[in-house]
Amino acid sequence: MSLKLKIGLWIFRVIPLAVRRAVFSGLAWLGYRLSVKHRLIVLHNLTRAFPEKSPAEIVRIAKASYRSFGRVVAEFSEITRLNPDNVHQWVRIQGLEHYDEARRKGKGVLLFSAHFGNWEIGNAAMAIARKPLIFIYRILDSQFLEEAITYVRATCGNISLDKENAMRPMIRALKKGETINILIDQNVAVYDGIFVDFFGRPACTTSGLALLALHSGAPVLPVFTTRMPDGKYLMEIGAEVAIRKTGNRAADVRESTQVFTGIIEEHIRKYPEQWFWMHQRWKTKKCQAREK
């Protein structure tokens, strides 16, 4: 661990959590006010996703989404303090029976989720409750943030795996019975994904999860870590999602990816304030794609 990271984590730890939450919520509010570009992205995304909502409600959700992300940042260093004795103070887990049943199949487990609630604390809670997992992610541009995030995740035993060229390592991991968690709610380039419906609009989505499930036979489960009114989190592990297997690989991948995306949309609709609306989810357009 670099000296800069040691100092940074020490500063985070000595500042009371309540103060951190207040500070980062304030910074999030400033971000909403000062960054016109990102504010317009959020408001546009929300207006298209919820045409039935009033402008005032759209603005309320937008501001709450910023605050939610601020809390994720403020709470991140708390992961280093989580252990079997105190994790229940942060997270209550529902659906572990689905996960245990999936593990008993002996083909590894594929979890999928979104940048929703506090996915990082959810990953840590899963590692403590059962076993560490492999988290697929994109390496950050900032070397300091990259080191910090990788270190904090590893304190619970979780492994961060760069999504670039990750297919073979993931297949090997599943053969060893490992658990892999993939967030599939981000826009991808046209050559990296397929278009499926998301909030009524075509969204270019990674096909990697469906391809991996078809190749490995590993069970696929949704998981969401939602912030509750009391400030704690509810981690919900869903039942295994059936994978379409007709022999037409392209159609099977598209249909399964649509099912996964539909599950994510359904959960976001329940708690729209907790999703990352700042992201340009619909950036890639169908006109950029050649007919396949």
Identify the meaning behind each predicted range.
Residues R103-E164, N187-I194:
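Catalytic core of membrane glycerolipid acyltransferases/transacylases, capturing the structured
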Residues Y99-D100, N123, I149-T150, I171, ...:
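Short amphipathic alpha-helical segments and helix-helix/interface helices
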Residues L34, K53-A56, R60-K63, R103, ...:
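Non-catalytic C-terminal accessory region of glycerolipid acyltransferases
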Residues K37, I93, G117, Q143-F144, ...:
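Residue-level recognition of alpha-helix initiation/capping sites
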Residues M1-S113, E146-I149, G157:
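Membrane-anchoring hydrophobic helices of lipid-metabolizing enzymes
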Residues N86-V91, R138, C156-L161, F199-G200, ...:
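Short, flexible loop segments at the rims of nucleotide/cofactor-binding pockets, characterized by
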